[in-house]
Each structure stands twice: as C-alpha cells, then as structure tokens.
Regions:
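NAD(P)H-binding glycine-rich loop region in Rossmannoid oxidoreductase-like domains
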Residues: 38-44, 48-104
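N-terminal Rossmann NAD(P)H-binding glycine-rich loop of SDR-like oxidoreductase domains
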Residues: 3-33
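Conserved C-terminal active-site "lid" loop/helix of NAD(P)H-dependent oxidoreductases
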Residues: 298-319
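Mid/C-terminal beta-alpha module of Rossmann-like enzyme folds, strongest
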Residues: 235, 245-298, 323, 331, ...
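Conserved Rossmann-fold NAD(P)-dependent oxidoreductase catalytic core, especially the SDR/UDP-sugar
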Residues: 21, 82, 92, 97, ...
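Glycine/proline-rich active-site loop of Rossmann-fold NAD(P)-dependent oxidoreductases
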Residues: 186-189, 202-218, 251-262
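Active-site Tyr-X1-5-Lys
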Residues: 154-192
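A conserved pocket-lining segment of Rossmann-fold NAD(P)-dependent short-chain dehydrogenase/reductase
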Residues: 157-163, 207-239
Length: 341
C-alpha cells in the first residue's frame, strides 16, 4: 500500500479533505490538487494531516477546466479520486458556471487518466442528485425507493431552472451521465466507480472558528441546534463525512466491483429527520444545552426520501454511522471551538 500513489482533487473541501486524511492514514502517497498555494498551508496545519506530511505533495492547478490541465499531474499514479466539483454561487448563469464546469472537469480528468497506463481505478464523487429530479423532489411522492440503479440523464441543460439547487442537481446528473458515456465510448483500461452520497454531515477540520462550522450541509444541523427556523423542507437523508471518505478509499480495492456505483446514506429507507438533532444533543451534551450554547430553538422540516444503500454496506462490509453520530460530530466540534474562542 505504501508504494501506491493517489491523485486527489478537491482536498480543500469538506469531503475531499476527509478523503485525503483517509488515504494518508492507510499508507497511500498522495498528490493533492489545489487551486492556490495558500490552501496547502491550511491543510498541512491540521492535526489529522501533520503526522503524514512526508506522504503528501501539493500540486497547484489554478483552473481545472483548461484543456490539458491535468497533463503530467497524473503521471505515475495508481489511482485517482476526483472530488472537486463546482457548488452553487451567486451566478444565475447556471449552465456556464455550474453545469458545464461539472461535466468538463470530470471529462478532463478522465481523458488525462486514459493517457497514464499505471492508473487502475478512478473514483468520482457523484451525488444522490444523480437519482432525484427536481420534479420528484417537489412532488408529494415519498413511496418510491431509490437504489444506485435509478440514475437519470438530464435532457435540459439550458434551463430555465427553478433555482440554484435545481441546476446543481442537473450538474451532478450530467457529470454522471458524461462519465458513463466516456466509459462506453472510450473503453479505458482503468475502472471507474462513482460514489453517490446523500447530505454529508460531520466535522470539517478545516473550519477553525465556531461561525465557520455552519458552512455547507453542516449548517442544517447547526441551524436546528441554534435558532434557524426554516420553512423550506430539506431532503431527509444524510451520511457521515467519514463514511463517505472511507467508501472512496475502499473503492480502490480490487475486491470491490469496478465500473459500478455505490450509494452512501444512513438510516436505511427511513432516512433522517433533521429536528431529531435536538434530542440527540439534549442526551449527549446536556451541559452545553443548559449553558445556552445550544438553545435548540431552530427548526428544519424534512422532505422524506427513501434510499436503499444496503448494497454498499454489503460490498464494503461495514454499516453507515447513525444520524446521532453525525450530529455529535458537528455539535462537539462547534462546542470545542466555542469554548476555545
């Protein structure tokens, strides 16, 4: 294992950072792709990465969309873990700034990998957005059980879109479809595995201040524990970030079926009820509740979604961490930073 080299993109993000830590802790050497040099200092300063500095090198690629951006970056690698993907921003040109980049970066790295004979597997971070159309999300149906085989190919990439999250879902589904098309048409020598997480929850070690803990999907948990009263339902499915990272690195193992896809979500088909976070924190962090650090005045309606990820648990041989573990991970990190402030 110590002789194997991985190239990992997106290491400055919530999932990508944990994938980096998981890979290093298992003895992989890692070539981590970042967009600016300052990101490497922040990553190297974390307690989880410090013990493994001799195993990691950072490579700056300012624009992953440039043709040939990965030229030379993948040389000598045994595997690639592609996590980087654009997130919704303030732009309303969703095709230009969200959908096209998601597709083009993925195809860019697949083309580069095809030129490197040593690469055996490419692992790509997809999303349950590759399963769920916006029309389904806003429907009243909560009976359909989705498996990893229920992906769809979006036919409308131009819009209009209902909102940024509608466009984000299309971007992930389009990137997934482009990956499948690449495998079919190019027939690369390496195998490709897509990992499809639901709402990713768990400590993000790159957040160093309490006000940063609420960034991204962890903000759903923190909003409930503090005082954010949302009226808009959020998909009631979640997964621990550590499990998502574990799945990415496990997927490199040749005993795991290649050219296959794996759904990552906890709680079985019943999924997650976001407001349960209050009872979890009352039970596990009663002093923080009594001290007013967690007023528990928030509210987050859950949109029931039924996902069956049992095939992933069977393939990898472990169970997804509970919603309780996810909540504790976020709450304890917020508490730690609040006390240290």
């Amino acid at each position: 294992m110590s002789q194997q080299l991985l190239v990992i993109t997106g290491v400055s993000g919530h999932v990508g950072f944990r994938v980096l830590v998981e890979a290093l802790s298992r003895g992989y050497k890692v070539r981590a792709v970042i967009r600016n040099a300052s990101q490497s200092e922040q990553i190297k300063a974390t307690d989880s990465v410090k013990p493994y500095l001799a195993q990691v090198e950072f490579t700056v690629v300012p624009d992953l969309l440039v043709p040939g951006a990965f030229h030379g970056i993948l040389d000598g690698a045994d595997g690639v873990v592609h996590v980087a993907s654009p997130l919704p921003s303030g732009s309303d040109n969703f095709k230009r700034d969200l959908i096209d980049p998601a597709v083009n970066v993925t195809v860019n790295i697949l083309k580069a990998a095809k030129e490197v004979s040593t690469i055996k597997r490419v692992i790509i971070t997809s999303s349950i957005a590759s399963l769920l159309t916006w029309d389904y999300i806003i429907s009243s149906d909560s009976t359909k059980v989705f498996t990893v085989r229920d992906t769809y190919t979006p036919t409308n990439l131009e819009g209009p879109f209902a909102n940024a999250m509608d466009a984000y879902g299309v971007s992930k589904a389009a990137a997934f479809a482009a990956t499948e098309r690449f495998i079919e048409e190019e027939k690369p020598s390496f195998e490709v595995i897509n990992i499809l997480p639901s709402m990713v929850i768990g400590k993000n070690e790159l957040n160093r201040k309490p006000e940063e803990v609420g960034k991204g999907t962890n903000g759903i948990i923190l909003g409930v524990l503090l005082n954010n009263k949302s009226e808009t339902p959020t998909l009631g499915v979640s997964v621990h970030v550590n499990d998502v990272a574990r799945a990415h690195i496990d997927a490199l193992n040749p005993v795991i079926q290649g050219n296959h896809n794996y759904l990552c979500s906890s709680g079985g088909v019943e999924g997650t009820t976001w407001d349960d976070a209050k009872d979890i924190v009352r039970q596990h962090l009663p002093k923080a509740v009594a001290d007013g650090i967690f007023p528990l005045e928030g509210r987050q309606p859950s949109r029931p979604i039924r996902l069956d990820s049992s095939e992933t648990e069977e393939a990898f041989g472990w169970k997804f961490a509970s919603f309780g573990e996810q909540v504790k991970s976020v709450a304890e990190h917020y508490l730690e930073l609040s006390v240290a402030k």
